[in-house]
């Protein structure tokens, strides 16, 4: 487990609006809630809007990052996903966590203050040390340079 400090940027968090929590003991990610001045906002069909979380995290440890993911129920039932599909929080970022919500459906969707809109997952990472080569010394792999579905559907 990694200890991650956070700042509360909106005084309603921890009272009127719950702080991030793991929904169950087996949950991999914390639920992040919508924080804005209004009681609700409407995302029109195909609209993308940046929604605040009212929180800032400082992961600090360069061996970790945060990944922001959509909530599966919002995407499946309502067409609400992340505008950038997945978000990355670098360990040295200290600003407010904002969620780009995109309504990819043809129906307006009302986002309510305090609604769970995304998930925040902390993952270990490894920074690579890249070095140029003319060719790869290892023998050709089974995959080689094939990509984009080259192994077929079945």
From Swiss-Prot:
Reactions that this protein is recorded to catalyse: dUTP + H2O = dUMP + diphosphate + H(+)
This protein's UniProt keywords: Hydrolase, Magnesium, Metal-binding, Nucleotide metabolism
Pathway entry: Pyrimidine metabolism; dUMP biosynthesis; dUMP from dCTP (dUTP route): step 2/2
InterPro entries tied to this protein: dUTPase (IPR008181), dUTPase-like (IPR029054), dUTPase-like_sf (IPR036157), dUTPase_trimeric (IPR033704)
EC number: 3.6.1.23
Molecular functions (GO terms): dUTP diphosphatase activity; magnesium ion binding
Listed transmembrane segments: none
Record-listed substrate binding positions: 71-73, 84, 88-90, 98
Species, as recorded: Dichelobacter nodosus (strain VCS1703A)
Gene from which the chain derives: dut
Function: This enzyme is involved in nucleotide metabolism: it produces dUMP, the immediate precursor of thymidine nucleotides and it decreases the intracellular concentration of dUTP so that uracil cannot be incorporated into DNA.
Stated family: Belongs to the dUTPase family.
Cofactor annotation: Mg(2+)
Domain of life: Bacteria
EC supergroup of this enzyme: hydrolase
Entry-linked CDD domains: trimeric_dUTPase
Record's protein name: Deoxyuridine 5'-triphosphate nucleotidohydrolase
SUPFAM superfamilies membership: dUTPase-like
A Pfam match: dUTPase
HAMAP family, alphabetized: dUTPase_bact (MF_00116)
A single BP term in Gene Ontology: dUMP biosynthetic process
């Amino acid at each position: 487990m990694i200890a991650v400090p956070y700042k509360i940027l909106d005084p309603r968090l921890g009272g009127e609006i719950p702080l991030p929590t793991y929904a169950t003991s087996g949950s991999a990610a914390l639920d992040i809630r919508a924080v804005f001045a209004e009681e609700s906002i409407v995302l029109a069909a195909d609209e993308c809007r940046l929604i605040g979380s009212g929180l800032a995290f400082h992961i600090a440890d360069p061996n970790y990052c945060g990944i922001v993911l959509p909530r599966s129920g919002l995407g499946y039932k309502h067409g609400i996903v992340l505008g950038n599909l997945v978000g990355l929080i670098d360990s040295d970022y200290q600003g407010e966590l904002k969620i780009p919500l995109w309504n990819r459906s043809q129906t307006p969707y009302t986002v309510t203050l305090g609604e769970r809109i995304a998930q925040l997952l902390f993952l270990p990472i490894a920074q690579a040390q890249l070095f140029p080569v003319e060719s790869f010394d290892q023998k050709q792999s089974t995959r080689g340079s094939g990509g984009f579905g080259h192994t077929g559907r079945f």
